[in-house]
Amino acid sequence: MQVDIIGDIHGCFREFAALTETLGYHWDEGVPIHPDGRKLGFVGDLTDRGPESLNMIEIVCALVERNLAYYVPGNHCNKLYRFFLGRNVQIAHGLETTVAEYRTLPPSEQEMIRRKFIRLYEQAPLYAVLDEGRLVIAHAGIRHDYIGRTDKKVKTFVLYGDITGEMNQDGTPVRRDWAKRYHGSAWVVYGHTPVEKPRFVGRTVNIDTGCVFGGALTALRYPEMETVSVPSSMPFVPEKFRTFS
């Protein structure tokens, strides 16, 4: 199995296009296709904050429908899904940018995007177990003893990380560094928490290098376990990046 797993995109379509081209994908058919049959993987959080969230929805839906990509949802995907279902969600923390894009469309196009994303989300696994169990893609990561489970506790972990219930001063949840306690044999590739460079800890890799906050968009090439990044065009916001001791 050969897959290029891409970190949190958050509507940064230009960087996504540049990264896929750097990885050797061709866009002749309107979506990135690799001549050697490699597939793309997405750790979720396709939308919000960046300028082209709807473009990302269209591209990923097309790739998944053609069996050219693996997609798992992130917490921002979960919130957008609930918005599209008509649930009462707070249109903030980035969702407002996607909703603003969405509301510029005529009603027929709004309905098409809404249906596409709902189908993408509902058909996606909570996390993807690939290569006969040797690789797991999970938005915020997953504990080794949670692999194989999909109960509420596991869903919270996969979407939000190992949260304590406490809050930081900036309003973000306090999270434990679960990767240091991961003892599974599978590689876990995840994002969710922006770091300035890809973070390898044991058999875990955080590839969210904060593209929407001015960092970079990163892919992990599997099974090579090499990272490839392209710089962000967004302003750099240093306080959005987490450092680990």
UniProtKB/Swiss-Prot annotation:
Entry keyword Nucleotidyltransferase: no
Record's GO cellular component terms: cytoplasm
Gene Ontology molecular-function annotations: bis(5'-nucleosyl)-tetraphosphatase (asymmetrical) activity; GTP binding; nickel cation binding; phosphatase activity
Annotated keywords: GTP-binding, Hydrolase, Nickel, Nucleotide-binding
Listed transmembrane segments: none
EC number: 3.6.1.17
Gene3D superfamilies referenced in this protein's UniProt entry, alphabetically: 3.60.21.10
Catalytic reaction list: P(1),P(4)-bis(5'-guanosyl) tetraphosphate + H2O = GMP + GTP + 2 H(+)
Obligatory cofactor(s): Ni(2+)
Function description: Asymmetrically hydrolyzes Ap4p to yield AMP and ATP.
Family the UniProt entry places it in: Belongs to the PrpE family.
Protein name: Bis(5'-nucleosyl)-tetraphosphatase PrpE [asymmetrical]
Organism (species): Geobacillus kaustophilus (strain HTA426)
Gene name, Swiss-Prot/TrEMBL: prpE
